Amino acid sequence: MKLHELKPAPGARTKPTRRGQGIGSGMGKTAGRGHKGQKARSGGGVRPGFEGGQMPLQRRMPKRGFTNRFKKEIIAVNIEKLNRFENGTTVTPEALLAARVIKKTGDGVKILGNGNLEKSLTVQAHAFSSTARQKIEAAGGRAEVI
C-alpha cells in the first residue's frame, strides 16, 4: 500500500444535508422545522432558560447569602507535608510553593497539626494551629509568624 492508494473508511466522508432543496431530498419545503410556530421562523427560538411562560427554575430557587468582596484566602498545610524538607531547613511559603506543596500562597499560609513531624525545621507562616506549634517545637524546630 502506498500513500496515493489510501482511501477514507466507508461512511467517514458524508456530504452535509442540504436543507430546503426539494421534496426528493427528504429535507425540502419546511426543511425539518415543522409547520409555522416560533421555532419555524427565521431567527426564531426561545432564549436559554425559557420554560414557555412558566416561572423558570432560576427564578423559582430562593436567593441565598452574598459574596464577601473582602474575604482572605488562607492556604492550609498539614504538618505531615513538611517531612519532605531536609533537617534544619527554614520552610517559608515560597519554599512550599517551590516544592509544590501548595499551588499558590493566596493571602497567607496556615500550618495545621494533622500528622507527625520527624524533622527539626524552622517554619515561617502567617498562622499556626496550637497543635501544629506544639508538634514543631516537640520535634526541635521553631514556629515563626511572618
UniProtKB/Swiss-Prot annotation:
Keywords: Ribonucleoprotein, Ribosomal protein, RNA-binding, rRNA-binding
Pfam families, per database record: Ribosomal_L27A
GO cellular component: cytosolic large ribosomal subunit
Bias type Gly residues, positions: 21-31, 42-52
SUPFAM superfamilies referenced in this protein's UniProt entry, alphabetically: Ribosomal proteins L15p and L18e
Any one GO molecular function term: structural constituent of ribosome
Keyword set includes rRNA-binding: yes
Positions of transmembrane segments: none
GO biological process, one term: translation
Segments for region (Disordered): 1-66
Entry-linked PANTHER family: 50S RIBOSOMAL PROTEIN L15, LARGE RIBOSOMAL SUBUNIT PROTEIN UL15M
UniProt record similarity statement: Belongs to the universal ribosomal protein uL15 family.
Role played: Binds to the 23S rRNA.
Assembly notes: Part of the 50S ribosomal subunit.
Protein name, per record: Large ribosomal subunit protein uL15
Species annotation: Pelotomaculum thermopropionicum (strain DSM 13744 / JCM 10971 / SI)
